[in-house]
Amino acid sequence: MELRFPRFSQGLAQDPTTRRIWFGIATAHDFESHDDITEERLYQNIFASHFGQLAIIFLWTSGNLFHVAWQGNFESWIQDPLHVRPIAHAIWDPHFGQPAVEAFTRGGAAGPVNIAYSGVYQWWYTIGLRTNEDLYTGALFLLFLSTLSLIAGWLHLQPKWKPSLSWFKNAESRLNHHLSGLFGVSSLAWTGHLVHVAIPASRGEYVRWNNFLDVLPYPQGLGPLLTGQWNLYAQNPDSSNHLFGTAQGAGTAILTLLGGFHPQTQSLWLTDMAHHHLAIAFIFLIAGHMYRTNFGIGHSIKDLLEAHTPPGGRLGRGHKGLYDTINNSIHFQLGLALASLGVITSLVAQHMYSLPPYAFIAQDFTTQAALYTHHQYIAGFIMTGAFAHGAIFFIRDYNPEQNEDNVLARMLDHKEAIISHLSWASLFLGFHTLGLYVHNDVMLAFGTPEKQILIEPIFAQWIQSAHGKTTYGFDILLSSTNGPAFNAGRSLWLPGWLNAVNENSNSLFLTIGPGDFLVHHAIALGLHTTTLILVKGALDARGSKLMPDKKDFGYSFPCDGPGRGGTCDISAWDAFYLAVFWMLNTIGWVTFYWHWKHITLWQGNVSQFNESSTYLMGWLRDYLWLNSSQLINGYNPFGMNSLSVWAWMFLFGHLVWATGFMFLISWRGYWQELIETLAWAHERTPLANLIRWRDKPVALSIVQARLVGLAHFSVGYIFTYAAFLIASTSGKFG
């Protein structure tokens, strides 16, 4: 018999319909469901695929470096980072007429180019790269790493090199190696790079392999380290009139705690960042020696979990049984990893604009907006994925006997209380926030703006004041000049920090008012509702009062036949599917808020945000409509301009988004009838009837159509907003 796709499932391979193709694609990565899979082979396959993932990442980043070196303007951008536009790569497009060629020839290039809004120029400049040759070297090195990863992946699939199951289940050793090796050693190496290459480069000293061993990063070398006078490394830092990349105003310190920003670059002090990475390295190198392996010293995680019984007996048997539950479930581990990574990605978004680490990136407004939005959306997808795999854990891996009366079992036992509390919080936030917005909207419409309900966010302002913001007049903690906290940090990082917090040209602790209060609660509504749907999906994944035997149907069942009413749309997959819409809309509100607040800040008219953000029409008219004018102008009677590509993408994004509804709102029977009619016509048309299907065409299943609809909705939604964001920001600020 011929081998048909999918090889991993003989049952599917013999399916006579097009279902074979779609179900084959859908389950290609669900190794657990493949024929002849064993637990050991499952772990080995996943392990080997990680090397493939690394190879792709290294190849991609290598491509970034290569194209900028080949077609970019890195060397001229360095001369004037604030006025030269960084080029990502050239555009070769046979459709371009003369107006298009002229519109896209920018940044000192000879032909049409794309402008880089990713921040790579600022990053490479900050870490000490200075020439195109440096970029080519980096690209080649990453290409080498990519090849190495592919070889490693292939190697670990060979019989002699396949790790055993016991190796994968050795949690303590893996933790030690990841904490010490991944985090500890890499942070130490990065500190080394910053101290030996980046900091000298910021002071006009060019360190490469040829002079690496000759140039001392600090005049006294290792002397202060060996004699215990570590404070010497912080003495004589760069002055406030230091010109980045030159010796003018430069100091000699390498590990400092200055606080605040470098006045010229508006970014964190490089010497502060080196100090930070050294501290991180120190912590993780110690943490990586915490767990007991074959040396018989350190903690055994299992012993820790078993020994800890919560006081008062209110949490049952505490953490007993958790070690094996987590260690034997790949989905539990993936869920934990995704939850952590999702939070970290969102934190990256929040911190990259408020505490910018890269030189001059704070003054590149479009890049700031693009990076914030990018990281928030990525975080949203990763976080929803955490709950998806949590639900799969409950269905495939959870063993009630093993977890009797421990914290995990008790979560399931009182899931009704958890879900109903989340539901109450969502309803409260939703009705009150919408009520305020609608009330204010009506007052504006009736011409009585003074009757709006405007609430000052006094608690948030108090927190900002505690961190040193003096605008609001709260005399508290760091904004109080006679408190112990103020006096303790006065000789160290505090002056730099306070200067940064109270200088209104950056994004650190922006002044907030009633508009912020309202949108904050709108976002809280979105977060709580998304969480409600995800948590309910995971906690009800094994069964509910309506369908106690749900776990027997797997993760993504459509219904249990026509005879059981109410079993449609209640699989854990359906909860994930619904939550993604809420996630996208919530991040929509987050990014609208961030972008509008910053546009008005950068343009110097913050009153526009303050006055218009308290009612719905303000958001629709003064943010969305007003800022889409650049897009609508991408093509006009006078020809085209450099925003045309975004105008086209804006339209195309709407098209993709709207296509999603074709899959989401019409059901399977309609498509099945349509397909049968088309097949009939096909078979009776000359020439067309010479081509026959090997598989009988059938409509997508309900679950598959939802997935396709969701994919189009998500992609269209993000494309549309990306075009809007980049065009409206770059159109204003060049």
Curated annotation (Swiss-Prot):
Q: Which PROSITE patterns match?
A: PHOTOSYSTEM_I_PSAAB (PS00419)
Q: Where does [4Fe-4S] cluster bind?
A: C559, C568
Would the keyword Iron-sulfur turn up in this protein's UniProt record?
yes
What keywords is this UniProt entry annotated with?
Answer: 4Fe-4S, Chlorophyll, Chloroplast, Chromophore, Electron transport, Iron, Iron-sulfur, Magnesium, Membrane, Metal-binding, Oxidoreductase, Photosynthesis, Photosystem I, Plastid, Thylakoid, Transmembrane, Transmembrane helix, Transport
Any GO MF annotation of the entry? electron transfer activity
Q: Which residues cross the membrane?
A: 46-69, 135-158, 175-199, 273-291, 330-353, 369-395, 417-439, 517-535, 575-596, 643-665, 707-727
Which function does this protein serve?
Answer: PsaA and PsaB bind P700, the primary electron donor of photosystem I (PSI), as well as the electron acceptors A0, A1 and FX. PSI is a plastocyanin-ferredoxin oxidoreductase, converting photonic excitation into a charge separation, which transfers an electron from the donor P700 chlorophyll pair to the spectroscopically characterized acceptors A0, A1, FX, FA and FB in turn. Oxidized P700 is reduced on the lumenal side of the thylakoid membrane by plastocyanin.
Q: What is this protein called?
A: Photosystem I P700 chlorophyll a apoprotein A2
Q: Which organism is it from?
A: Triticum aestivum
* Taxonomic lineage: Eukaryota, Viridiplantae, Streptophyta, Embryophyta, Tracheophyta
